[in-house]
Design a protein with these regions (language model features):
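Polytopic transmembrane helical bundles with strong interfacial aromatic enrichment
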Residues: 4-147
């Protein structure tokens, strides 16, 4: 009986990166499809802008931290899922880029540099979409390639 419990605990620990990818996927979907559109509909433009400027950097930072924790867990646990590791590294890079260009996006908006704002905003949207896809791929890869 104790061996079965121990085995289940080991399996749970080895699935930490999988669980983190599920969390990241949920965060991205919730933020992108519920929070941001709702804010733009129910709050005036000025207040929505303030709120979104506050929340987006934290959004990128949370995904960056979770991706880093997942990568660390992968290495620490000695999990031999290299594709998942590479995907996590890409997510980390994408979120670093998004985090650091967010102030530039805000400044472009403030200075009415709409073309620059559009390009950089689109870049963060695309990088976030790629992060979502990578995490979905990690989930699928993990599910179909058990240890």
């Amino acid at each position: 009986m104790d061996f079965i419990i121990f085995t289940k605990k080991i399996k749970m620990i080895n699935n930490i990166p999988f669980t983190i990818s599920c969390i990241i996927t949920g965060i991205i979907l919730f933020q992108s499809f519920f929070i941001a559109p709702t804010i733009n509909k129910i709050i005036n433009t000025k207040e929505a802008s303030k709120f979104l400027r506050y929340i987006w950097p934290k959004f990128f930072l949370i995904i960056l931290i979770l991706s880093t924790l997942s990568l660390i867990a992968n290495y620490y646990l000695g999990i031999e899922k290299n594709i998942a590791k590479y995907f996590m590294i890409l997510c980390i890079v994408f979120m670093i880029v998004c985090y650091f260009i967010t102030p530039i996006i805000n400044k472009a908006k403030d200075n009415s540099k709409n073309k620059l704002w559009s390009i950089l905003h689109l870049a963060t949207v695309i990088l976030t979409l790629f992060a979502l896809i990578l995490n979905i791929l990690i989930i699928n890869y993990w599910e179909f390639n058990h240890n």
